[in-house]
């Protein structure tokens, strides 16, 4: 029925060009048909409608983001904020785009500006989580692998200060929503990588997995905290569960399991999982180093 639907949608668009229902119908038809560029052009055609329509700007920003056009995203976010300065999602989109472009201080500023328009504690918690994540990205900028390059990142002069701000932001987030599972997980994981406050990390990780249904990433964090606490047998059991649930076959999870097996003296199986991690894209130098040290 595609030809008939296409004819109907295009006919309606020509006959009722200013009807929002028709514009949305035609745009959604184009998107469903894989014609993203045409849908984008249609939305852009209506950005000057009076009164301006927020949803058209959101759609343009979403499609430009999907197409990975950061310059265009910035331009349309700027236009949207001029027209709708109180819309928190446009401020968040600005923060996400700046983060994607690795402009971390500017992203943090945009996220903080969005806090002024947040109306619920749940949203404030999410935003503070974004701020914490961005401070962490700034702290480890330039390091290819978060686990193995963490020690090298620590030696950077700004690392401690940036991570202090990261944890401070997470604390703000959890004051607004103590059950923000993503923040609990990230907070616990980064503490485990630094090897500090491990009992606190374990409490947060335990809460994160209690709040979610078999999330392999959160189980990985829990296993890693247990591993850092020296509870390797428990860590192995939890990591086995994480790997069984991980349909993406994350390289980090495979390598983590290899590290746990290595610590338990199961070198042969450890190397198997390290190699699996390598096949999934884990840094080759880090795998080589593990093999040589094994």
Residue ranges and their predicted role:
Residues 1-268, 274-294:
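Alpha-solenoid helical repeat scaffolds
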